[in-house]
């Protein structure tokens, strides 16, 4: 919260993002070495927003890091409510303000969805979300198998 309060988000991100990205690459390589058909999933709120490794030659470095990108969307009020419910140590007003600061630093769902390979709307029941995730999981596994078959 200090980084948001003092306007030092970029400084914090410039320290954290390269380390996280390097660890993701190491982890993905480890998984691929064990099973070429494996589907690995990375959860990240700032896939598109991170400035690490973006350049004039490669303005979309996430495309070299991920085979597929899935964006999960939800209405802003629903996301705010969920955030307030799970954040510890803040009263409701402070948690809502913290959500608003974080949300302002992220691209809109619409902007992210336009760049995604798949979009899951998380605006219904948990059961519905699980069904959508399971369906997508099967698609991703099938795509992995098809790519492996093409490589042979």
Label each region the model flagged.
Residues 1-11, 15, 19:
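N-terminal phosphate/diphosphate-binding loop that engages ATP/GTP or pyrophosphate donors
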Residues 12, 41, 120:
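Residue-level signature of catalytic and energy-coupling elements of molecular machines
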Residues 15-16, 74-75, 103-104, 124:
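Short beta->alpha linker loops
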């Amino acid at each position: 919260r200090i980084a948001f309060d003092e306007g030092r988000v970029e400084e914090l991100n410039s320290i954290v993002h390269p380390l996280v990205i390097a660890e993701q690459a190491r982890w993905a390589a480890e998984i691929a070495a064990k099973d070429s058909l494996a589907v690995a999933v990375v959860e990240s709120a700032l896939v598109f927003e991170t400035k690490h490794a973006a350049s004039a030659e490669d303005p979309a470095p996430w495309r070299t890091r991920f085979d597929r990108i899935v964006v999960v969307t939800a209405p802003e009020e629903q996301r705010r409510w969920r955030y307030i419910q799970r954040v510890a140590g803040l009263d409701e007003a402070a948690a809502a303000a913290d959500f608003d600061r974080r949300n302002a630093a992220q691209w809109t769902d619409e902007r992210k969805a336009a760049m995604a390979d798949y979009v899951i709307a998380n605006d219904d029941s948990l059961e519905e979300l699980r069904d959508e995730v399971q369906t997508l999981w099967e698609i991703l596994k099938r795509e992995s198998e098809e790519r492996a078959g093409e490589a042979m």
